[in-house]
Amino acid sequence: MTTAEGLRGDALTSAFKDAIAGRPDRLYVLLSNASGLPGTRVNMVLAQAFAVDCVALGKASDRLVIEMCNLDAERAPGDSGGEFLPVCGVLALGFRSAHDPNPALRKKALLILHALSEDFRFRVREVVPIALARLGAVMGDVLVHEFASWTDGFFQGAAALQAMAQPNFLPVIDDVEALLARLDESYALAKNAPRSASRYPGFKALVDALATTPAAFATRFGIPVFDHLVTYANTQIKELRAAVEAFVRSPKLTSRYADETKRVQRALDASVPPPRDPTLAVKGMRGRGKKRDRR
């Protein structure tokens, strides 16, 4: 995300001051109207401008930021301008906790972001990894270790992986073993999920993260990541096989790590079960039961 300036325009800046003083209604209306929602593109420039002003104001903005994060779907319905309010709150929370080293604020921020990572409103969920990455850019490996408490949930695990893959967080991660532990935990969560979980949006979000983030990790840490993907390839779960296949096809890797991607592909190929041999079918196994009696 590019560097942004604060809120512009007399109406917005005046409404922001009123909101800080405990009168947020006018700010909520202005932000909602300029949100771009309902629509396909959220006004992230405006959300970032709000976050910048919250950072500039410091601790005095925290009450408003947390209030906006806590707006539920009744007060801020999904797919409406109202959904933009918690989006702004989440982004501002990430900015504020990144700029203020207060442990209490960071602990509270992580608790709020953990809860919102599984919010019913998908735009709120989508901004959580961005907020986490802001925090990760200053916390580094400490946050990677904190994510051990995130990888026991589908949406939370997806948010943690996506945050670590962000370009402002990944370069400051030095503990490759901790990162790979989070990747292993996320993979195990998906692998050990009941079959019915495949219909759950959280499972799909985690599988999507497993398909997209390992390539970024591999560009940072190289062969150790490929070693783990080789083990992940040994599965018959179609969603996880597709995730590994997406890793192999990643344009980030095909030229620089051609031999390693081929190694993962060979592991995938080797894990394909042999085709069923019809000559081994036992006579009388087919056609039994009530349907046969009705022929």
Where are these regions (language model features)?
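Alpha-helix capping and inter-helical loop/turn segments
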Residues: 19-25, 50-64, 91-108, 132-141, ...
